[in-house]
């Protein structure tokens, strides 16, 4: 799809069998989701943003569905005010910025 930027670029995603809304954030390296249970093992990670550093759980090889695309990606789970789709996932679905 082509998304204008007059409002926040939000997309519905399906992760861990749950449907969530997330912000497409080209400034974010990683995909970060609000607290949720995901299957499999995780490892601790620290990520930094405008608000400083936060501890998150890194889950690898998580199936995600976004805009009709199915991908397997790394997902970080932790305290975030907004679910964020980062460049790690957007590159997999062929997302580009065009001017």
What are these regions, as identified by a protein language model?
Residues 8-13:
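Charged, flexible boundary elements
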Residues 14-99:
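Aspartic protease
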């Amino acid at each position: 799809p082509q998304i204008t930027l007059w409002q926040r670029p939000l997309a519905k995603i399906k992760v861990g069998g749950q449907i969530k809304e997330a912000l497409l954030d080209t400034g974010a390296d990683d995909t970060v989701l609000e607290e949720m249970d995901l299957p499999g093992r995780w490892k601790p990670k620290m990520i930094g943003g405008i608000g400083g550093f936060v501890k998150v759980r890194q889950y690898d090889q998580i199936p995600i569905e976004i805009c009709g695309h199915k991908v397997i990606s790394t997902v970080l789970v932790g305290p975030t005010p907004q679910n964020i789709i980062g460049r790690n996932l957007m590159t997999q679905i062929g997302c580009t910025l065009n001017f």
